[in-house]
Regions:
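Small/polar-residue-rich segments within soluble enzyme cores
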Residues: 1-68
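Short, charged, low-complexity patches
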Residues: 28, 76, 80, 298, ...
Length: 455
């Protein structure tokens, strides 16, 4: 009897972020579970006739075995390794930052890299990770320890971690306001340090900014600007655009994912039995309150902005190939064109490039002297326990600015500020565009260098 064997070519070291195969060659987690019908094949059947002594007198094949197909992933191994290593390294760095708002509790996070022009996921990392071989070894004690780990390493935070987006949500609120006609790209709004909204006093993180437009509001991540614009736009319009961008539902990626939640009147009524107030809209407009999204949703969202409203389905499977070399499956190449005017998209993009490239940008220091233009948005989301815990840090970005190729979303739990997560994106872009001198001889990234799961 021949044993069936499945292996993940060149995937050692990053398996925990993608697959786990159990006995009898059945994928139990990640992409292998999703693609099991492609990978598994069909068992053959051979019948034997034996005499009273157990000696075979005749045999015949009732059904020949059909081997499983080879599955090629979109993951680029070099980029994946950089994502995994940079995520872990920067989480450990953030713990050491000395500041009254940092409790040294950064302990987990995720990063996703997506090709904005086709939806391919080029890297996906979740920290802490785990070695899936612990399940194969059937070590009950080790498995129980893994499941009971308070940092939940078995959870793929890239697709199942739900996080308040913080200020990374502001570009969406800006689009909702622009498309609703509440503001234009040139509208200037007075931004005081303090203002009452719905019987609550709100303060601005940037102090008294005077009259500023959208670009400057995104550049400096002005909370007061978005409090006021969000209330004028109305929560229903904001929710409408959040749904258009794909928040509150699955992205369609092949592996397990959660849907997250959108702050809305319906959500508050359903889960709290309470009415909605203007102050709720103000908080929702800066990515707080009941907003909770996954990194895969966030990277899909920023990708849509980058490619002028084209919405692709994120995917990990590049193709499936049968024994004869015939391609039997490729993901759909079509996309949905979202109904956003180019003028409004350009206004938001100008604000996002200012975040990274202007003197006052909230991520300018992290991308200082970078050789090409990156557009992005920082986000710092409160957990509600800021007296004893650090806030979460987020950063979304895309590059190059003029002709985008990749989008990145990163979240660090208790990462203190969004700007502290930006170096992870910088590391990934250095690798993707071969800016690391040690890798210049390899040339530009080739999407055909895909990881292969083979029989």
């Amino acid at each position: 009897q021949e044993e069936m064997e499945r292996y993940n070519k060149e995937l050692e070291g990053v398996e925990g972020s993608v697959p786990y195969t159990a006995s009898d060659i059945v994928g139990k987690m990640g992409i292998e579970a999703a693609a099991e019908p492609i990978l598994r094949g069909i068992r053959g059947e051979t019948f034997r006739e034996v005499d009273e002594n157990g000696k075979t007198t005749a045999s015949y094949v009732e059904r020949p075995a059909v081997p499983g197909q080879d599955l090629y992933l979109t993951i680029d191994l070099d980029l994946q390794k950089v994502a995994v290593e940079s995520l872990e390294r920067n989480i450990k760095r953030i713990r050491q930052i000395e500041h009254k708002k940092n409790f040294g509790d950064a302990n987990a996070g995720a990063v996703v890299v997506m090709d904005v022009n086709n939806g391919e996921i080029l890297a996906m990392a979740s920290y802490p990770d785990f070695d899936p071989r612990v399940f194969l070894e059937n070590n009950v004690a080790a498995i129980n320890e893994l499941w009971n780990n308070p940092n939940a390493p078995v959870v793929n935070r890239a697709t199942s971690g739900n996080y308040a987006p913080g200020s990374t949500y502001k570009p969406l609120v800006a689009i909702a306001a622009l498309e609703s006609g509440v503001i234009t790209p040139n509208t200037r709004i007075n931004v005081p340090y303090k203002e009452e909204i719905g019987n609550m006093i709100f303060t601005n993180n940037g102090g008294n900014q005077g009259r500023i437009n959208l670009e400057h509001a995104l550049e400096t991540s002005s909370n007061m600007f978005f409090y006021k614009v969000g209330v004028q736009t109305g929560i229903d319009n904001i929710v409408k655009w959040a749904k258009i961008f794909g928040f509150g539902r699955k992205t369609g990626i092949e592996i397990g994912e959660t849907i997250g939640s959108i702050a809305s009147k319906e959500y508050k009524r359903q889960y709290f039995g309470e009415d909605w107030y203007p102050a709720n809209t103000a908080m929702a407009s800066i990515g707080q309150l009941y907003n909770a999204f996954t990194p895969i949703q966030l990277v899909n969202y920023v990708s849509i902005i980058a490619n002028d409203g084209k919405k692709f389905t994120p995917h990990l499977i590049k193709m499936a190939v049968d024994e004869s070399g015939t391609i039997t499956y490729e993901p759909p190449k079509d996309y949905e064109q979202l109904p956003i005017s180019q003028k409004n998209l350009d206004a938001v993009k100008r604000g996002m490039i200012a975040v990274v490239n202007s003197e006052d940008g909230t991520a300018a220091e992290q991308f200082k002297d970078f050789p090409f233009d990156v557009a992005g948005k920082t986000g710092t989301s409160e957990t509600g326990r800021e007296a004893t815990e650090s806030s979460n840090g987020l950063f979304v970005c895309y590059a190059p600015y003029e002709k985008p190729e990749i989008a990145i979303a990163v979240v660090v739990e208790h990462g203190v500020w969004g700007r502290e997560t930006a170096p992870i994106c910088r590391d990934i872009m250095m690798e993707y565009f071969r800016l690391n001198k040690e890798r210049q001889n390899k040339g530009a990234y080739n999407s055909e260098d895909a990881i292969e799961i083979i029989w």
